[in-house]
Amino acid sequence: HNIRWKDVENEPVFADVWPQFSPLFKGVDFVAAHNASFDRSVLSACLTAAGMPVADERFLCTVKLARKVWPGLVNHKLNTVSGHLGITLQHHHAGSDAEACARIAIEGLRLEPQFAALNVR
C-alpha cells in the first residue's frame, strides 16, 4: 500500500492514538469493513500488543454483503464493487477506502435490510 517506514517512523504508536479513536466505536450498531475478518484480526492484534483489552465491537463485512446483493459481479473486491456502484475510489487510501466501504454498506443494506441482523458479528 506504499507505506514506508520513513512515512511513519516519527508518528505515534497505536497505544498512544487508540484512546482518541475508541470513543468513535461506542454505541454504534456495527463497524463496516471490507473483509471484516482481516480488519477485526488486525485491531485485536494491535490491542493485544498494546496491552489493552480486545474490543468487542460488532463488524459487518461488506464483502459478504456485496456477494449477497450483487452476486453477478466478476469479483467482490472493493474497487470492483465501488465501480459497479459509481463510487469514486482512490484505492488503498484509507479515507477513500473507508468512505467506499460505508457507501457499499448503506446501499447493500438498503437492498437487503435483513442482512445485518443475520451477519453482524
Question: PLM ranges: what are they?
Answer:
Residues H1-D56, P71-H92:
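Conserved non-catalytic scaffold segment of RNase H-like nuclease domains
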Residues V28-D29, T62-L65, G108:
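A short, structure-level motif marking secondary-structure boundaries and short turns
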Residues L43, L65, C101-A105:
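Buried hydrophobic packing segments
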Residues P53-A66:
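Conserved beta-strand -> loop -> alpha-helix junction used to position metal-binding or nucleic-acid-contacting
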Residues A94-G108:
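Acidic, divalent-metal-coordinating active-site segment for phosphoryl/phosphodiester hydrolysis
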Residues I104-R121:
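Acidic two-metal-ion nuclease catalytic site recognized across multiple nuclease folds
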